[in-house]
Every structure is written in C-alpha cells, then in structure tokens.
Regions:
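Short extracytoplasmic
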Residues: 31, 38-66
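Hydrophobic alpha-helical transmembrane signal-anchor segments
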Residues: 1-45
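Juxtamembrane "pre-transmembrane" interface segments
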Residues: 300, 312-355, 360
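A short beta-strand structural signal in non-transmembrane regions
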Residues: 256-257, 302-308
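Non-transmembrane, solvent-exposed regions of membrane trafficking/translocation machinery
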Residues: 55-90, 94-294
Length: 395
C-alpha cells in the first residue's frame, strides 16, 4: 500500500508542478506559475547588450600611478622635477639635475619591472608597451566578466548568457528582460568605493581649485558647487567589504550598511582611532557621497553610508558594493530587444509535435504489446510529467 501511495503521490506532484511549464504564462506574478522551465533568449525574448570595457581609462590611471611614484622617488632622492607630461601611452618627466636620473630610473624599475623606460638628456620617458597593455587588458576583462556576472545574478535575472566577445567586449543576453534600464544602471557604474581623510585646513588650495601633491579635489555628489580637498591616498576601500545591504537610519532615512573583512576592520578601526575629530569622506566613483566627522573610534568593522537615497537607490548601491568595483567603466556599444514571436511559434510547434509523437508511440506500444504496452505508456507519461516538473522547479 505504501509503495503504491508513494508512486501515485509522486506522479500527482509531477503533474501539478508541470502545469506552469505547460501553460507557460510569462507575465504571471503567481509564485506557483513562476516555477516553470526557463527559456532561452531565442524562445522567450529579452534583451541583448554588447559592452565595451574602457581600457583607455585604465591605462590613464596606470600612468597617473607612475607619475605619483616618480614624484615620491624624486623626493626621496632630493631630485627636483621641472615638469611631468602625461600622454596617451607614456609620461615624460623632466628633471633639473640629470645626474640623478639613472638612480631614479633604477628605483622606478624595481617597482615596475615590466614597464619600458628610456633616457633622453634630462628627461625620463616611461611607456606602456603592447605587452604591458595586454596584461592589463586580460586582467581587466576577466575581472569585469566576474563582476558583471555577480551584478546580474544579484538583480534576479535567470539564465543570463555572459561571455567575452573579441578583445575588449562582453556579450550579455538576458532572457525575459523586456526593459533592461535597471540592468544598464547597475552596469553603468564602476562602484569604486574608497575612504579618504578630508583636509579642512588648507582652504587656500581648495578656493584656488589647485590640489597640492598628495591631495585631490572632489565634488559633492549632490551639489557641484561643494568641493572637498581630500588626501589622495585611500585608507581603505571596497575591496575589503564582505557585505552590504540597504537599511534605514532613524535620522538620515534610507542608507546602506556595510561590513569589512578582518583586514578592512583593522584598517578602519585604526583610521577612526587616529583621526577622531577629523572628517572622513566616502567616495564613490570619484564623487563624495558623505563626509561625516569621526566622533569616536569605530572598531567593530561595520558602518553605514547615508545620503539622499530612496529605497531603490540604497538597494542598488548595496548590490554594486557586494558585487565589487569594475576595474574600468563599461560602455554599451550595442543594444537590442529580441521579440518572442519566433519563440511562441516554435513552442507551439514543439507542443504539437510532442503530442503527435506521444500518440503514435502509445498506439505502437499498445498494438505490439497489448496490456503491457498500455502500462508502459502510463509509466512513460508519468516520467515525462516528473521530468518537466523537476526542470521547472529547479529552474
């Protein structure tokens, strides 16, 4: 009895849970009808995006890093720099005393062994050659693929196709996504989060809009007329985050709470302990979100980011921070909406073919094997329902 009851129950459950995949109502919000087999872009329709990683921005950042390194090396060697020119593929550093150039070049080479350098009179030329560019390119594309995948998964999109296309492009197919605006917003932000100390004392440099060495001037996210003079060196960044989620602050409204890993918690604790009374700016993609004053050490490894957020803004920012920062901005170079007209025809034709095939197989089994053939048909049909229900439930 128990064996029969178990078999009948499994078959009934298979029939019930296969219903969503058989009737396939794509627009239904019913939780039960959502448990259906996920169709691909060609059958279900959706969105097609082709993204291009802006590697030029990455190369420029690398050259800026070289420039900062040269300044530090020159200062350590008491060498005066006349001028630094940052071009598209190289930087040219002019020194007052050419006798110290070799020493500076060797020190720089110890830091960046794979970068090409050459001397011309009192100038040091640092180039990003093709080999170095390829290394940066491959690393950036690989990292971008991983982060795009995380962001898409966080958005709830099922069965996306994400793959590299060519040298610096990423192909993205999103079945069932009719309006990809939110996806585009999530992918359009680099989400590079850093924390910097605010220099409130050097008001003359801020008023003159000239950042001294080791400093940078950054706009407020909500008002371009508000500027901050920040220490250029990031004290801790988004790479140390292990969690972020939308939350609600009683005084500031919607916010994003975050938690650091062990290393980040130690850094953040030291920063807040050493700088009580100073302001700490939270910088996202080159603009200041908030710059609160440190009233007491924060040693628990967690904090909260406040701003003029609504619930969706806070949720999206949390998604971006959890997924991690893109190494370089992404540009949408091609966008298409794929209709499901062909898919609907294919599905309808497939259903008709399946029914005709099933009827013919059942007739053949009954004609050849009689009663045993009929029993085999029942088992076959039950098996089909169970497989469809499992595929729909698993997704």
């Amino acid at each position: 009895i128990w064996k029969s009851f178990t078999v009948i129950s499994l078959v009934l459950l298979g029939i019930i849970f296969s219903i969503p995949s058989i009737i396939y109502n794509d627009d239904s919000d019913n939780w039960f009808l959502k448990n259906k087999i996920n169709l691909g872009l060609d059958l279900q329709g959706g969105s097609y995006l082709l993204l291009e990683v802006q590697l030029d921005v990455l190369y420029q950042e690398e050259l800026e890093n070289f420039s900062d390194s040269i300044r530090l090396i020159a200062r350590d060697n008491s060498a005066k720099i006349n001028q630094i020119i940052v071009n598209e593929n190289d930087i040219i550093v002019s020194f007052e005393d050419k006798n110290k150039i070799n020493e500076i070049k060797n020190s720089f080479f110890q830091m960046y062994r794979s970068v090409s350098t050459q001397l011309e009179d009192n100038k040091l030329i640092i180039k990003i050659d093709d080999m170095y560019k390829k290394t940066i390119q491959d690393s950036a594309i690989k990292q971008s693929l991983e982060i795009v995948r995380k962001r898409i998964d966080e958005s709830g999109t099922k069965e996306p196709l994400i793959q590299r296309s060519g040298k610096k492009r990423i192909l993205l197919q999103l079945p069932g996504v009719k309006d990809p605006e939110r996806i585009k917003e999530l992918l359009g932000k680099t989400a590079k989060l850093t924390f910097h100390l605010v220099d409130d004392e050097n008001t003359s440099a801020l008023n003159a809009n000239i950042a001294p060495f080791g400093k940078m001037i950054v706009n407020d996210i909500y008002d371009d007329n508000i500027k901050y003079l920040l220490n250029k060196r990031s004290l801790v960044g988004g790479e140390n985050l292990v969690d972020a989620k939308g939350s609600f602050d009683q005084t500031e409204g919607h916010a994003v709470s975050f938690r650091f890993d062990t290393e980040g918690a130690q850094k953040f604790g030291k920063i807040t302990s050493d700088n009580v009374g100073n302001r700490l700016a939270v910088v996202l993609d080159g603009v200041v979100i908030t710059a609160p004053r440190i009233n007491s050490p924060i040693t628990g490894g967690s904090g909260i980011i406040t701003g003029n957020f609504n619930a969706q803004d806070a949720s999206d920012l949390a998604v971006l921070l959890r997924a991690g920062a893109l190494p370089a901005p992404l540009e949408i170079v091609e966008e298409r909406s794929v209709g499901a007209g062909l898919g609907a025809d294919s599905i309808a034709a497939g259903k008709i073919a399946a029914v005709i095939g099933m009827v013919l197989v059942c007739l053949f089994m009954i004609l050849i094997y009689g009663v045993f053939g009929a029993l085999a048909n029942v088992s076959l049909i039950a098996n089909i329902f169970i497989i469809i229900s499992l595929l729909g439930t698993i997704g």
